[in-house]
């Protein structure tokens, strides 16, 4: 989760706080753009900074774009931030739209005569798919993981971990729910966007920025 709620540094480049009113954003845009315009600023980074100022203003001046940026900044950082203009929702294992997806974390064990290896995987699926995948993984673990005592013990741990994972709700799921809420809205599927935003809201424990952003997003979906 982004620590400062500004994954791409748009608020930073305009020198405004994340809760800045539109009037301040406009004021800072004109001031910063004038200062960094490459026609009269000899700084070697002037072109890059001026372009970023323009991109930042284009996002933050629009209520809906700004809200989407703020939500995605909760779950992405600068290095993995997605293209907001080409955001696609995650779908179930059959490649279909699904309003009840979760991230399933599983532990896979493979034994050898000299020991064993284990790795954790993450899959996006619905509840029914998750149960089937856990059973399938458990069978595979038993077939691959019975050759040594240490692997057998690790398999018991993996079995418990995998079955508990079906019901897990954590940061990975919050990321999935936010992503799909924004992606479905961008794809004009407000029904799915609303459901995912509501589910994400249930995972927010405190009355902080996350809850405020999600409630605003849901209100906009309800209004339109």
Residue ranges and their predicted role:
Residues 2, 163-178:
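TPR-adjacent "capping" and linker segments in tetratricopeptide-repeat scaffold/adaptor proteins
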């Amino acid at each position: 989760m982004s620590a400062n709620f500004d994954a791409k540094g748009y608020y930073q480049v305009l020198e405004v706080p994340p809760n800045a009113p539109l009037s301040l954003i406009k004021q800072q845009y004109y001031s910063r753009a004038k200062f960094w315009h490459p026609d009269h600023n000899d700084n070697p980074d002037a072109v890059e900074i001026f372009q970023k100022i323009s991109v930042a203003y284009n996002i933050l001046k629009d209520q809906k774009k700004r809200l989407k940026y703020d939500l995605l900044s909760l779950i992405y950082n600068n290095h993995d931030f997605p293209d907001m203009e080409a955001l696609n929702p995650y779908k179930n294992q059959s490649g279909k739209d699904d309003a009840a997806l979760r991230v399933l974390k599983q532990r896979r064990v493979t034994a050898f005569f000299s020991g064993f290896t284990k790795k954790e995987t993450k899959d996006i699926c619905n509840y029914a798919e998750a149960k089937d995948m856990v059973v399938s993984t458990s069978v595979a673990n038993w077939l691959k993981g019975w050759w040594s005592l240490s692997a057998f013990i690790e398999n018991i741990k993996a079995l418990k971990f995998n079955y508990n994972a079906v019901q897990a709700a954590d940061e990975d799921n919050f990321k999935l729910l936010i992503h799909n809420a924004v992606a479905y809205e961008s794809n004009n599927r407000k029904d799915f966007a609303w459901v995912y935003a509501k589910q994400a809201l249930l995972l927010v424990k405190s009355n902080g920025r996350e809850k405020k952003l999600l409630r605003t997003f849901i209100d906009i979906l309800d209004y339109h």
